[in-house]
Amino acid sequence: MQDFQIYLAGGMGKFGKDRFFESNNWRKYCKTTLENYDTNRYKVHVINPNDYFNFADETPRYASHKEVMELDLNRVRHSDLVIINFNDMYSLGSMAELAIAYDRRIPVIGVDTSEQNLHPWQIEMCQRIFNSLDLMLDYVEDYYLTWERRWVKNNRMYYNKSSTSKRIAESSWWFYNCY
């Protein structure tokens, strides 16, 4: 069975110690869900950067922010898939992770539960952007982990109408698979 590594990118620093859970709860949910999928193809490993270094520790485990950056970017470079939560669309760390994944041709799946007006590059660097964690997780399971064929009603997926490239047509059912 092959290993499949997924890195969870998204804002962390803006939430601080008082709101650390906002940067971590979605990651814990995704990690638990993805690692418990029953797939015969892969052993799924999900990287939550908060598991190694986080901003809520009273005594930080890291000596410098460079150490944190190097570890996180190394994890991105060795991932098979990156999931980015646009919970802080201005996070420089998240944008660096997104750009490196895109440059290395690592697929990036986005989540934007607030349906913000994302920068066009943020949109274009993602294969898909969803407005729901659960829809995104279903897609990752079907498309990347099990390769099952499923029908998806596309009006449930996030579509940024200001984007010049329409990822999803507005009024039909789309069939996706990755054969």
Residue ranges with predicted function:
Residues 1-179:
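Conserved catalytic or regulatory cores that recognize and/or transform ribose-phosphate-containing ligands
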